Structures are given as structure tokens and as C-alpha cells.
């Protein structure tokens, strides 16, 4: 049996641009694509933390080091500059591979620069990591 598993996640990235008239896709900084093991043209799900919108599109490579997260095409009606998003890619694999597979989880700072790379989808970085406090849910930070 094939299983669809979490393969890659870029957590709480800030949308930097939206272009309604582009042909579609999401533009992602090449550094983030590498960190998350995403390929150009790979299917990604975008989850907008601010408004709850979820959509499926494909990744295109943005300028390395730019921090770009650009929403292109019709998705720009749903996701806007300044919104926090989670970018997710899934992989289909045989059960034995799925049980051993470790996804790539990338936490970013307010400028979409990686601050933590890991494999545990339930992990949240601690406060010692530069910029990590901004990544946490404000309800948790207030405790």
C-alpha cells in the first residue's frame, strides 16, 4: 500500500508579494527550497494562518537570499502580502519507506530566513534560537 506522508514544511513564512496576473504558482526563495527539499514544479499546499485559506499549487524558484514568498495567479485573491503561511509538500511512498522517512521542517524568521531545520513536525523551536519567539503562537508566548 502507498502512503501519502509529509515530506516538506516551511513553517510561518511571511508572504512578501502577490501577483494576480501571473500564471499561477508560489515563488519561494531558492534557499528555502533547498532547505525544505522542494523542487521547481513540485506540488505544494499553502495554508494561510491569518484567514484559514488552503490551496494547492506548485513551487517556482525565487531569487536566492531574497526571502521571497510570492503568491501568483488566482491564489492572490485568497492569500495576501503580510499573511503568515505554512507551505507543505507531501510524498507518496511504500509503507516501509514511510515508517522510516524523516520530513524536512523549516522554521523561518520575520524575513523568511531559516532559523531552525528539523524532522519532527510537532517540534517548536525554543526561545534561544534567534527569532524563535516570533514563531510561536502568541497564546503560548503570553503564558
Curated annotation (Swiss-Prot):
In terms of InterPro entries, this protein maps to: Asp_de-COase-like_dom_sf, Asp_decarbox
Assembly, in brief, is: Heterooctamer of four alpha and four beta subunits.
Stored CDD domains: Asp_decarbox (cd06919)
- Protein name as catalogued: Aspartate 1-decarboxylase
PTM-bearing positions, type Pyruvic acid (Ser): 25
Any one Pfam family match given in the protein's UniProt record, by short name: Asp_decarbox
Reaction equation(s) it catalyzes: L-aspartate + H(+) = beta-alanine + CO2
Positions annotated to bind substrate? 57, 73-75
Which NCBIfam families does this entry report, sorted A to Z? panD
Cofactor note, please?
Answer: Binds 1 pyruvoyl group covalently per subunit.
> PANTHER family annotated for this entry?
ASPARTATE 1-DECARBOXYLASE (PTHR21012:SF0)
Q: Which HAMAP family match?
A: PanD
Q: What cofactor is this protein dependent on?
A: pyruvate
Instruction: Tell me which family the UniProt entry assigns to this protein.
Output: Belongs to the PanD family.
